[in-house]
Structures are given as C-alpha cells and as structure tokens.
Amino acid sequence: MIVNRNKPSKNTIFDFDSIAKLMKKLFLSFLSVLIFISCNSTKQVAENEHMLTQNYIYIDGVRNKSSDLQKYILQKPNSKFLNLPFALYLHNIGNPNKPKTPSEWGKKNPNSYRFVKTIFSEKQSIAYANSFINLNKWFLKYQGPEIINKKKIKRTADNLLAYYKTQGYFKSKVDTKVNLFKDKKATVEYHITKKNPTLLDTINIKIESKVLDSIYKNAGTTSLLKSGDLYNDKTFRNEANRVLKLFKNNGIYHFTESSLGFYIDSTRTDYKTNVGFLISGNRLEEKQATYVNTPFKLHKVTEINVITDYSFTKKGEKLKDSVSYRGINFLAHNKVKYNPKYLAQSIFLKPNEIYKDTLRKLTRNHLKSLKNFKSTNIKFNTIPGTDNELKMDVFLSPIEKYTLGLETEITHSNIRDIGTSAKFSISNRNAFRGAELLKLSFLGSYFNSNNGPGWEIGVDASLEIPRFIAPLGLSKLVPKQMSPRTLFSVGSSFQKNIGLDRQAFTFLSDYKWQYNLKKTIQLEIFNTQYIKNLNINSYFKIYSSEFSNLNNVAKVYDAANNISINYPLSNNKDNQVSEAINFMRTVSNDNNFRATNSDEYNKALNILNRYNIVTSDFLIPVLAYSYTYNNQTKFNDNNFSFFKARMANSGNFLGLISKNTNANNKKTFSKIPLAQYFKIDFEYKKFWDTASNSVFGFRTFLGAIIPYDNSDIPFTKSYFAGGSNDIRAWQTYELGPGSRNTGLEFNVGSLKFLTSAEYRFDVISKLKGAIFIDAGNIWDITGSSFVDDDAKFNNLSSLEDMAI
C-alpha cells in the first residue's frame, strides 16, 4: 500500500502544504471558538419547551434504522456535521431579543452611538449600528433549535399509518411516545404495529365499452393484479397506468385515468379482499354549457401541420409559405427553411393512422434532439364536423441560426504554470437545411515557462447530422426512433514551449444512437490522429530527472572504463540530446559494461526506450465501440447508476496493408510510425440520495491497453494517475507505475485501476462539504524488458501497490 508523501512540487509557485496547514489551524481555531461560544445548544429554548434530538421508529417492537421511513417524519432534529449541529451553534451566537433598528441599538448602546456620531456623523453612527444588527441577523438566519411540536408528531403518526395501509396492513396502528429530559432536550418514539397483511382474493374486471373491450382483449397482455398477491397500492397504480397506456396507444385519444376505478373491501376479518376493476365506457364532455356522457371512440390523425418558425409575437399572423411532403404540411410565416424530407423523419405520427400516445412523445423528443429549436409544442384538436378525426399542429420555435460562444479560464497545475486559456466558437444551425449543426471553434492558451512564454493554438470544425450518413443502405440498420446521429470532425493544434511542442491533426467520423432512454451506443468508424513532436531537443529539459539519472550512469561508465569524456553530459541545448543519445547507444553496445554494471546498463536502456517512445511521431487510426447505461432521469437526480464500456483498436487495417518498417523495426504508414494496440475501458458510478441533501457516491474504473506487432503505446494514449478527478492525494502523472517511486516528471502505464467513495453533504447554508477516499494505481502489462519488475502487474498480489 502506498501513502501520499505530501511533498510540495518543486515546480509550484506556492508552498501549498504550508497553506493547507495554516488553513487547517484557522479552521480548528474557528471551530473551537464556535463550540466554546455556543456549547449550550438549548440556550434559546424556553423553560416550557424541549428541543428534539432524536427520532426512533420501532416496527413490531424492533427498532428500524432504514431511511425509507424518514420522508414521512415531519419534524427532524437539527442537521449535524461530524455529529455537531454547526448551524444551531451559529444561530445561538445571535440573539432574537437584540435591537432590530438603529434607533433601538442607539438606546441600548448610547455611549458607542454618541462616540461614532461625534467623531464622524449621524450617517456613520447609523451604519455602525446596522453592522451589528446585520451581523446578528446573519447568525439568526441559520436553523434554530427544533422545538417539540405535538401537532407535527400526530401528523407524522398519521403519515406512517397511511403508508402501511398502502402496503396492505389495514389493521395496523401507530403509537407515539415523547421522552422529555431535564436539560430541555427530548426524543420521540414511533411504535408501529403492522399485524397481518391483506391478500387479493377474487378479481373482477368490467369494461363498459365494446370498443375498449375489443382493444383490451386483442392486446393479449396480463393484468398485474393477481389473486393471492399481497395488497399494495403501487401495484394498483401500475395496473391503472398499464391500462391507460394501452388505450392511449390504440387510438383512444380522450381516455384518462379518471375512467378507471378500483373497489376493495378492507373490512373483512380474514385479511383478504375482493377487487372490482371498472373501466368506464364514457367520458364527460362539455357541450353548450352542460356536461354530457360521450362514448369513447377510436381516433385517427387526418391532418398534420408543422409551423417551422413559430413565435409568440407572430401568433395570429398569416402563414405565407407552405410545403407538403407525404401528407404533412410544413408552414412558415416567412419561408420554410427546413428540407421537409428530413424534418418529416422526426414526425412519427402519420396522416390517416390511428392516434398513438407513444408516437406523440417520440415526435416531441426527436424534435428536441435536433438542437435546432428552443421549444416544441404539439397540440391536437378534433376536426369540426367529425367526432373521431384529429388535427395535429406542431409549433417549432427555432434557435438563432448563428450563435457565438466564448469561454475563458485561468489554469494552474504541476504540468503547466499559471496561465490563461480561451475558446471561441461559432455555430451554424440548419447549415444545409437538414437540421445539421455546423460548429467552428478556435482555442488558445498562454502562460510563462522556464523556456519563455508558452502558447497553444488550435482550430476544430465539426458537422453533426441528425441521421446516419452511410453507403450501401447501412443507414437503415438503426431505426430513426433511436435518434441516430452522425458526427464528422477535423481539427489541428500547435504548441510552443509546451512539452515537445506537439503538433496534432485529428479526423473523426462516428455514429451514435440511443437504444432506449437509458442505453446509448457509439461507434467510432474513423478516429484518426497524427501526432508530430517539433522540439525533441527539449526532451531532457522537460524530463530533467532522466538527464540526472543518465549523468549518474555516465559517471559510473567513465569510472569503469577509466576515462572522463562522458561525465558530466553537456547542458548545452543544441548538443544535449545528440550527446546523450550517442552515449546511450555506446552503453547499449558495450557487453563488458553490461556484465559488470547491469543496473546502470539497464537504466541507460530504459531511458533510451522512453526517449524513443515519447519523442516518436505517431499515426493513430482508431476503430472503437462504446456502450453507455445511465438511468439518471433528470439533472438533479441523485439516485442513479452509470456504466460505460469502450473497446478500441488502433492500426489493425493499416497494419495489414502496410509492409514498411523503420530503423527500430516498428511498422510505418507513409513513413510515420503506426500505433497498433487494443484498449478497453470500464467505468461504473453509483449514487445514493441519503436524505437531508446528502449524497453517497461510488466510482470504479478499470482500463487496459495492449500493443501488438512490435508497436509502442503512444504517450497520449497511456494511462496516468493523480489529479483532481483521479487519486486526489497525488498530482497528475506523479503516481506509479506499481510500487515504484521513480521521481520522474511523467509516469504512465498500460493498466489502470481506480476506485473511490465519496460522501457529499451540506455544512451550513450553501457551503458544501465532502469526505472521500481514493484508491488505485497504474501498472505495466506489456511485458517489456525495459520495465522494472516493481512497475509490472504480475498477479493479484500487485494490488498491494494500490495507493490510498
């Protein structure tokens, strides 16, 4: 097991460890003062009142600690952090009886008020008084003591009783007990006696309409209500929802849940109940100021209109342009700017087909996914003169065709000094009249480095098409209901005084579709990157520890051969790399030195191998498949699971057709070294909402990359450990591989395992806190002879090298 050394980075401007220690001392001092001042948590509790400190729930005499029942409790103790009610402590520093206006404060503190008024002015004395008043208000805004409230206790008992009745415990009861203590504190006990649950007995279904009866029977589905099952309100709700969807998706447009009724007998003494399920054949309809019963009928959509440039300001204005495509009318106040052929692919309800609610929802979601419209509104109206024909109107409010974006950021890390970065983008929606999104982005960054000003510039262009673009009819393999999308992207970036001044060119072509609401699939057909290093002469300036290690080898080599021509190696930038390379090649061919000084010999070969990998140009043609599962229903949903698997291969096709190799026997394409590897990544995240605005999260990641055909792994595709989104106790690239403490600036591996657990909570007001533990490491699994044994993953015993 590896524990963080917490040593300050030699490249940082500030001693962050000293700052952290100072902040820790200040926090502990503040905490001590806070607790000392407010140690009496009941100081603002009146003599005839008691503060709630704990709720206890007992089910059939056994204490229940589950959080499931907590949502039914209306009165809860003051929130705590580290088992201390900080918000209450802050509240108790304030005093509700203190003056609330400057005049009241002046009467309470006449000497101070007159002193400020005499020295300065009346206005300043009022401001002085307000500063104390506002400070007192600030303390009082935090949660005060939770006083026992008998009405809330009674309502909580009613809530618990109602809950257990929904679970079929009709004979259950809830008793309460309030324990009052001399220190003005109290606890509340809720004693729940469930008794026996009720079972479903005979189930009778009555359908009052021949049309509905025919749909119900032809569906061939099975009811969720079954004789002998435990009574549960949720089952009845699910059954009602099932039947509602059945009719709404088979042409019964006006059908609602109010037409469904369940009848049960909860008075039987044998803990069984008969169930009557009534499906009404009529609906209430308002006609001429009176309500009449109208039989349900099968509705079909006979007219579809799509207004492509709707806005509230144009409501009621005449539509000047119209285009029809396959029975769908596309209308506009000015001009229809969308190709009807492509926009019609998002309309799943068709003319003269029966109404289906799922197709209405699918149409709305598909139109939203086009990223071309601010809002999408769909309305249905009965066509005058008919009683079963619908007109469908789709109102689309387009986003501005051209939009600009600007992002700026100040950055600092152990990799780069403090600097600034900016990104400017321009988006063109509906670029080719098919709801495409064309985006052009420019990015740049600037910072100071030891080698002078450093900068990076880049440009990216992407075209997102809301359908598949593929030859030979392959575009039809994925149905449009899955919102298929094609993305083409090209980009280039250039660096100066950043690393080896890398120049990169990227071309991407991928396909993405949503298998269902929770599952997404992505296929990267052609994800190709060309990386060229323009300044390899800076290698030993960047990897200075490598140069120090090589100098130590040179010292031993000179001593072993009784010469003094290699040590120390040149510090001259123009000669440094060539001299170091010549020296390493000399050592690699010296069998006598290998026999007498094997450690130094291997160290020189390792440095030479790393130099060749890091400085090498690479062509990286990737074919990848990704599967993502995410059951998060909305942005603020804190109960969800996330899983992603990605499998990638680089260089397989080009490796087969290319027979060329370079001097290092590495396969090349157009004289560029070809990256050939298989890579697979798995990531799983799970979050639980633990109530009281607290969330517990778990994350694990496992990834492996294996080269083949004598290829090396490009540095940019290797795994690293450390950083704010990784193992947070280590800086980026600092950890690993394995149990090695290399002292190198950039450590990478071909296997990575990471796991973390985190508890997030509210401290006070909007101040958030988190407690977390990270564990993991990187290892080498390539089997390379240039890698030390303590950096390799040999078997499960290597997991002992995990850092925490």
Give names to the regions the model predicted.
Residues 1-51, 163, 700:
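Bacterial Sec-dependent N-terminal signal peptides
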Residues 40-43, 346, 419-427, 433-466, ...:
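C-terminal transmembrane beta-barrel domains of outer membrane proteins
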Residues 40-369, 478, 496:
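Interaction-mediating elements
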Residues 215-218, 258, 379, 395, ...:
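Transmembrane beta-strands of outer-membrane beta-barrel proteins
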Residues 249, 454-456, 460-697:
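Transmembrane beta-strand segments of outer-membrane beta-barrel domains in Gram-negative
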